[in-house]
Each structure stands twice: as C-alpha cells, then as structure tokens.
C-alpha cells in the first residue's frame, strides 16, 4: 500500500536487539499512517551483531520502508537512547 498525498506523514517504530553483545541479532520496523493505520511491518534476523548495530539497522529499515511507501515526513520512535540522541544531534560520534 502506498501512502497517499494526504497521508504522506508516517509514524515509524523501530527496534533492534542482540542476545549477547555481540550475539544473534534481529531488527523490526512498523510503519503507520499518521491516523494509526498499519501500512507495513517488517522483521528480520541479521546474524551476529552488537545491540547498537541492530538498533541502527532497524532505524535504516524503518526509513527505507517509509520511503518505499512514498512517505515525505517521518516521526521516528525507538527505545535506544544512543540512536535517539544521535539523531537529535545531542550525541556526536
């Protein structure tokens, strides 16, 4: 389902994690229209990774899926302090 021009704003929830650090890791992204309508959900195993790598891969997956759906404005939601603060320019790498 493509995002209509009227709903070009989407909300993207992302999460990634590893069992062990590093260890077997997985990522997920859920894309919803601004009104809450589910547009897409994806999850995948990514092999061995650290928790931070998994969180970043989840962020990229969410952004890629939103772009593929035609979104022009994103609200990104995640639980990684590192990712949130880096994206908001509070942490420098």
What positions do the PLM features span?
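Extended beta-strand/beta-hairpin segments
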Residues: 7, 20, 24-26, 43
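Short beta-strand scaffold segments in enzyme catalytic cores
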Residues: 27-31
